[in-house]
Regions:
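A short, aliphatic-rich beta-strand micro-motif
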Residues: 108-116
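ATP/adenylate-binding site constellation spanning eukaryotic-like Ser/Thr protein kinases
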Residues: 74, 124, 140
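Intrinsically disordered, low-complexity terminal regulatory regions
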Residues: 1-66, 144-150
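Regulatory loop-to-helix N-cap segments in sensory/regulatory domains
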Residues: 128-146
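Sensory-domain boundary capping and coupling elements
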Residues: 115-129
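Regulatory sensory and allosteric helical modules in signal-transduction proteins
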Residues: 47-50, 56-104
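Short hydrophobic/aromatic beta-strand element in the GNAT-like acyltransferase core
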Residues: 41, 111, 124
């Protein structure tokens, strides 16, 4: 299914004009993507310090059912996208080694890293579907452009 990410990008760019708070920006992006495309779960995990040292992905703004709160570096699809610094498309989450099952209803997933001005990952956009193979490489450029709004 071809999704019109260009229109969503334009809508979000106008909506977020002048807004500097990253949590607000993440919340609006998650809401617009979720409502526009009817994804099952749409949200962000932020790179955050762990109390015992190091960093992890910590749940940020999202739309959908309750979610995992903490994701370790290089674990699951989100942690792997963070570690590899690249978008990961997973047609069938059951086939992804080390998949973290926050819900048995998630069947496919795409995770897009968010980079700061020096190229470090600061967050990931995680989108889940109840359908197998709901995402493809066709989704990558549009979603990467949208997260550049952060």
């Amino acid at each position: 299914m071809k999704r019109d990410y260009d229109s969503v990008y334009q809508q979000l760019a106008a909506l977020l004009e002048g807004e500097t708070d990253p949590v607000v920006r993440m919340a609006e992006i998650a809401a617009v993507l979720h409502e526009t495309f009817g994804f099952w779960w749409t949200g962000f995990y932020r790179v955050a310090p762990r109390p015992e040292g190091g960093t992890e992905l910590l749940l940020g703004p999202f739309q959908g059912p309750v979610a995992c709160i903490h994701i370790p570096y290089a674990r699951g699809v989100c942690g792997t996208a963070w570690a590899r610094h690249k978008t990961i498309v997973v047609p069938d989450v059951e086939q992804f080694p080390g998949h973290i099952a926050c819900s048995a209803e998630s069947r496919s997933e795409i995770v897009v890293p968010v980079f700061n001005e020096i190229g470090a990952v600061t967050a990931v956009l995680d989108i889940d579907s109840r359908e197998l193979a709901a995402f493809s490489d066709d989704d990558v450029p549009g979603l990467e452009k949208i997260v550049s709004l952060l």
